[in-house]
């Protein structure tokens, strides 16, 4: 089987190369925004008009004549920015993402080369079109044939992400166990075998410092040197928060994936669960402050990324991930199967009102998720996407985040 894998390395460019890379990233951003504006204008004139990469790519020479400095950027990188827009529209129509937005300077500055690059791992250097040879920190051995290179700027440092492809044998998972996983706010992940992974809450840890930095930024003169310095501090802190979260997720998913051949999770619609409860001017929302805190905790813990990592790591290890309907998983008694809201009146405790069974609520949820996974394997029960809602006791949530 073919395996695609990405490796990320820090680049060590010269000052001239840094200026050129900023220019190339800016050119790609301009082309992306012009293409999106053109597409929107065409759709306004004719609402049956569909996005076509070929049509927009044919406009690229005309844009280069209008803006001569676009000719300084590599043609491949400009074409790949149009490919990115094509992918954005494809994800939008597949309901995987929002409608494409215009790119802002300083956010996600990057460009990609699908060919024309060279890599010398033994010499710790990369050749990129129009940039020449660049040194990089060879922090890990790279396997496979390089397919493309994406150069990106983050926190003032340039990175090269190299996607590789290689043939591997169909893996066989060393374990034979199956486990249910329940994700939550108080506990990040609870397994049906009783193992618990506590929440790291990286944003909550740094929230006070972030607020202090943002208040200091508001007192600076915009675009002054002090403003830029303070802006850099905020960007670096956001990067630290993201790195703490990413590190914890990788360690957690690796541990679970290595020890269990089959993992059963809830098919949660994270985007729907983390929507704002403010409502509209005519119809105000309820428990807005509590819902805001819940949304912040869900996004802080990275439930979607947790599932994504589990799925690809299980595929690489020869295991599998089953997503089941989360409806009533935290309200069903695993002993007598009685379903009632009264079974779980608090965040932590589950007490069945019929048979008296009592246990930790998250553990009960994980046991029920495992049972639902067995039902899928035995009977082929399908997941109901439109009913994928996780039930949490409103009283406890309100008290915790009000």
Give the ranges of each region predicted by the language model:
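Positively charged, helix-rich recognition surfaces that bind polyanionic ligands
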Residues: 5, 19, 130, 138, ...
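Acidic carboxylate diad motif detector
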Residues: 54-157, 279, 296
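An alpha-helix initiation/capping motif
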Residues: 49-50, 54, 76-79, 83, ...
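Gly/serine-rich nucleotide phosphate-binding loop at the start of the catalytic core
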Residues: 1-78
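Long, hydrophobic, amphipathic alpha-helical segments used as structural scaffolds
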Residues: 36-43, 89, 93-100, 166, ...
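Short alpha-helical "patches" and their helix-cap loops
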Residues: 42-51, 98-107, 382, 386-389
């Amino acid at each position: 089987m073919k395996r695609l894998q990405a490796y990320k390395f820090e680049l060590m460019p010269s000052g001239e190369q840094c200026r050129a890379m900023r220019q190339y990233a800016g050119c790609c951003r301009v082309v992306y925004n012009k293409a999106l504006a053109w597409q929107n204008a065409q759709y306004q004139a004719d609402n049956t008009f569909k996005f076509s990469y070929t049509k927009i790519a044919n406009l690229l020479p005309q844009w280069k004549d209008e803006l001569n400095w676009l000719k300084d950027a590599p043609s491949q990188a400009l074409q790949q920015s149009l490919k990115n827009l094509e992918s954005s529209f494809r994800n939008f129509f597949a309901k995987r993402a929002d409608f494409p937005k215009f790119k802002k300077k300083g956010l996600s500055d990057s460009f990609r080369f699908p060919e024309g690059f060279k890599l010398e791992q033994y010499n710790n250097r990369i050749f990129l079109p129009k940039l020449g040879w660049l040194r990089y920190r060879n922090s890990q051995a790279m396997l496979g044939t390089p397919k493309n290179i994406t150069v990106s700027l983050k926190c003032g440092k340039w990175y090269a992400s190299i996607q590789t492809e290689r043939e591997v044998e169909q893996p066989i998972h060393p374990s034979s166990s199956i486990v249910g996983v329940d994700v939550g706010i108080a506990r990040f992940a609870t397994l049906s075998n009783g193992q618990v992974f506590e929440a790291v809450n990286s944003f909550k840890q740094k929230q006070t410092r972030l607020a202090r930095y943002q208040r200091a930024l508001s007192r600076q003169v915009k675009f002054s040197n002090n403003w830029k310095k303070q802006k850099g501090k905020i960007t670096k802190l956001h990067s630290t928060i993201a790195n703490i979260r990413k590190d914890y997720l990788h360690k957690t998913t690796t541990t679970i994936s290595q020890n269990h051949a089959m993992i059963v999770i809830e098919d949660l619609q994270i985007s729907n669960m983390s929507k704002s409860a403010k409502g509209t001017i005519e119809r105000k929302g309820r428990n807005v402050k509590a819902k805001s805190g819940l949304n912040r905790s869900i996004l802080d813990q990275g439930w979607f990324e947790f599932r994504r990592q589990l799925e690809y790591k299980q595929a690489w290890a020869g295991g599998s991930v089953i997503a089941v309907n989360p409806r009533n998983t935290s309200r069903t008694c695993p002993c007598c199967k009685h379903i009632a809201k009264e079974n779980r009146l608090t965040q932590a405790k589950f007490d069945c009102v019929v048979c008296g069974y009592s246990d930790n609520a998250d553990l009960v949820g994980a046991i029920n998720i495992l049972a639902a996974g067995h039902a899928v394997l035995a009977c082929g029960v399908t997941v109901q996407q439109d009913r994928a809602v996780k039930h949490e006791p409103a009283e406890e949530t309100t008290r915790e985040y009000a």
